């Protein structure tokens, strides 16, 4: 079964459809690094960075050698920054109109079904007018359009991630939304032999997967950012069915690199308990204080960032804190003068082992402060973020760590994409 994958990014939605038995004929994205990732993992697709606003869908269809109606699904997620509730939203953002050329592809290819994925901010964009226009355009082309909001954690993804899907089949045929395979909830990790397989035989509804289910088999130690492409060995066999699913036939671990930090940030992380936000730092510091082990870790622990790489003001602040600690001035009030400078401590958040991750975002490329590992005083690695998104370990992300985090944060979780692909496949087969 064939797809056209527009605004494809790194290929999360495409990977989900591939797992369901589809293959992409053509993929388009304006970001060259993201398309390079797509091409590496979907080598048979014709890939293009040409502007979707200027390409000719008819020429593309003819170049691909397909007639109208021969493609099964035209799918895509128009850039969501203009719709997003994460950060400032602008109703006049030009990116909000990119769904118009998307429907030009639907009109030209006349697929058996179409699918649009986007953030929940789309629902209220311009008072709902953008969504209404999307539905009207689909129905004008003969498609019965439905709109659903799904949380990825209900479809086998160890992450809370609510997204809107607009979809429909040709000739007015209805497509049922996918039924949840997992239920929102909290639990401890389950050993491999006791947990039924995802998408296979077993209870129809399973507990939501957790951070522990996702990453407890990965090494505590991580690579520095520049070594993000270097492979590592798995330290132990998979502990859960999800981990086995993610590993597949992979024999080595890739992209297990994390951001480094100065001692000030390391101390902030050390104060946080699982589930804590940065607002808890002062309370935790007052309760437990600073012991010699924490001070030694801050002064030269593994994973520390070289102060010479940092801004002048950061180097000066780091040096001042070290002098305070050397002098034995470790009262909570004195240390908090450094840890809560300009309110920065409030943005930190440590994950919980026994709950799904919160939403992975592209901003992790710049700052992972709200993705602190639940058991280690470091930020999550690229591969751990990919696990939260349900990218299999065989999925490769070429390029820098910055680009990897950005692409992963922007992606559709493959298992959520697979759930949509399976229900579309049933409807159009």
From Swiss-Prot:
UniProt cross-references to Pfam families, sorted A to Z: DNA_methylase
PROSITE patterns the record matches: C5_MTASE_1, C5_MTASE_2, SAM_MT_C5
Active site: 80
Reaction(s) the record says it catalyses: a 2'-deoxycytidine in DNA + S-adenosyl-L-methionine = a 5-methyl-2'-deoxycytidine in DNA + S-adenosyl-L-homocysteine + H(+)
Ranges of residues in domain SAM-dependent MTase C5-type: 1-429
Source superkingdom: Bacteria
Entries under InterPro entries matching the protein: C5-Methyltransferase, C5_DNA_meth_AS, C5_MeTfrase, C5_meth_CS, SAM-dependent_MTases_sf
BP GO annotations: DNA restriction-modification system; methylation; negative regulation of gene expression via chromosomal CpG island methylation
Similarity comment text for this entry: Belongs to the class I-like SAM-binding methyltransferase superfamily. C5-methyltransferase family.
Protein name: Type II methyltransferase M.AgeI
Provenance organism: Thalassovita gelatinovora (Thalassobius gelatinovorus)
């Amino acid at each position: 079964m064939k797809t056209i994958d527009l605004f494809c990014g790194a290929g999360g939605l495409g990977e989900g459809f591939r797992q369901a038995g589809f293959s992409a004929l053509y993929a388009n994205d304006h970001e060259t690094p993201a398309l390079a990732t797509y091409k590496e993992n979907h080598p048979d697709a014709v890939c293009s960075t040409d502007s979707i606003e200027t390409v000719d869908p008819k020429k593309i269809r003819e170049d691909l050698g397909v007639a109208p109606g021969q493609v099964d699904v035209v799918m895509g997620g128009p850039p969501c920054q203009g719709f997003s509730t994460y950060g400032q939203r602008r109703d006049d953002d030009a990116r909000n109109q990119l769904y118009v050329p998307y429907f030009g592809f639907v009109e030209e290819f006349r697929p058996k079904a179409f699918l649009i994925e986007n953030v929940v901010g789309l629902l209220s964009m311009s008072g709902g007018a953008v969504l209404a226009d999307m539905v009207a355009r689909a129905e004008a082309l003969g498609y019965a359009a439905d709109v659903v909001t799904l949380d990825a954690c209900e479809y086998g993804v160890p992450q809370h991630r609510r997204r809107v899907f607009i979809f429909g089949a040709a000739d007015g045929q209805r497509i049922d939304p996918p039924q949840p395979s997992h239920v929102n909830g909290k639990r401890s990790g389950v050993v491999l032999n006791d947990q039924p397989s995802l998408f296979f035989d077993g209870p129809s509804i399973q507990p939501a997967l957790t951070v522990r289910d996702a990453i407890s088999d990965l090494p505590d130690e991580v690579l520095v950012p520049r070594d993000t492409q270097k492979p590592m060995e798995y330290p132990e066999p998979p502990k859960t069915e999800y981990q086995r699913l993610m590993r597949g036939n992979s024999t080595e671990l890739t992209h297990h690199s994390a951001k480094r930090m100065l001692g000030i940030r390391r101390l902030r992380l050390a104060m946080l308990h699982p589930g804590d936000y940065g607002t808890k730092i002062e309370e935790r510091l007052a309760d437990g204080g600073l012991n010699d082990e924490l001070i030694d870790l801050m002064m030269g622990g593994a994973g520390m960032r070289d102060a010479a790489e940092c801004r002048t003001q950061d180097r000066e602040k780091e040096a001042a804190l070290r002098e305070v600690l050397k002098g034995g001035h470790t009262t909570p009030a004195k240390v908090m003068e450094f840890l809560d400078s300009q309110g920065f401590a409030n943005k930190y958040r440590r994950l919980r082992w026994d709950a799904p991750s919160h939403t992975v975002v592209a901003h992790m490329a710049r700052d992972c402060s709200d993705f602190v590992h639940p058991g280690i005083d470091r930020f999550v690695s690229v591969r751990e973020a990919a696990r939260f998104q349900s990218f299999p370990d065989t999925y490769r992300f070429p390029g820098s760590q910055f680009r990897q985090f950005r692409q992963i944060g922007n992606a559709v979780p493959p298992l959520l994409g697979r759930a949509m692909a399976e229900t579309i496949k049933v409807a159009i087969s």
